[in-house]
């Protein structure tokens, strides 16, 4: 693989019991790029996203064939530490899910789990993470208030800060703005542009406009298959596949 490739799947099949949800997915994700996964509901894009940090392991009847590599190491090898994998490949979910703790503790929790105990180090890392998530100025005077008192958009940025605190290399985002208003959505999108300078970002979105605004590369999924992938501008102006064109132009979906 090219040295710029941070993560890739090769011949990936995924099953829920006897049902095959993903068919032969081969896709590369480059360093410091945003890749948008698009496609109609049920097409497999979120299932694929959850394969990238083995969240689907939590489903007893699930099964994976093929491989997914992070820095050319197969994340499904038996010796892989899944907790460490999920530190390296962080995830932000569709609905903000802060812990019922203070703003400070939401960010510090993952650091403590990963062995950080020094108070000064924790404080520095919490501030740094909140700054990276563009939230510090809004919460710096109420760090010990409940995170549940934040607005939806602030809660989502807190969840991003929580993911960033443990220094991931890849950030997965499953429709991170779908539950937010337009102003909060704009802040999340601006944040994605900033974060890609440091991270590889993979985002699932139902919004064609959002995919066009935030991503460098777009991958179109349909009925569990990867139909087309390429430069976002090209995909949205000159798609190479009729199914891609029909979906992007709203003929189905």
UniProtKB/Swiss-Prot annotation:
GO terms for cellular component: plasma membrane. GO terms for biological process: phosphate ion transmembrane transport. The keyword Hydrolase does not apply. It is found in: Cell inner membrane. Gene3D superfamilies: P-loop containing nucleotide triphosphate hydrolases. NCBIfam families: 3a0107s01c2 (TIGR00972). This is Phosphate import ATP-binding protein PstB. It comes from Oleidesulfovibrio alaskensis (strain ATCC BAA-1058 / DSM 17464 / G20).
